[in-house]
Amino acid sequence: MVIRVKTKDDFPLDPDAPRLQTALRYAATGSEHRNDMQIFPSSFSTPLGGDPFPEEGIRFTCMVELAQSAGELRLNSNDPHEQMFINCRYLEHPRDRERLREGVRIILDMMEHEPFNGIVEELILPMEAHLASDETLDRWLLENVWIGQHLSGTCKMGSDSDEMAVVDQYGRVRGVQGLRV
């Protein structure tokens, strides 16, 4: 989730500085996992080709790690050229929405601290109306959520008796003859 901020005109944005320089890892309130959330600021002093946020300034990205929502990926046919069915189901689990709401509010609280007084001109997104209640913030989150990492993943390896195993100990994909990973 991206929180967009307009910086003050006199705040120097260094076009040679890395866009990403630091990250905050923390455990969401009530989490049983350590570091299940991540927040990082990014500087946008120069345009990036295809970047959806053209204004100069900064943004804060809040990421839910160890999401409880689970998406779905399946083949529509055995034709390798046909697009597969993908449903990410972002924020489908209430706990993921709760954690992301908390992350957005942590960012907004950080921006109220004195070190940001000389940096932040105004909040661009979310707007005040989005912050009016959990319901309006959830609606905004669901409309604007996106994946924040490069797509990659792992599939469980295990015995035939393990329903969650996708491949056997030799990397053979279950249910697809002749396919190994």
Report each predicted region and the residues it spans.
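FAD-dependent oxidoreductase catalytic-site/capping-region signature
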Residues: 12-181
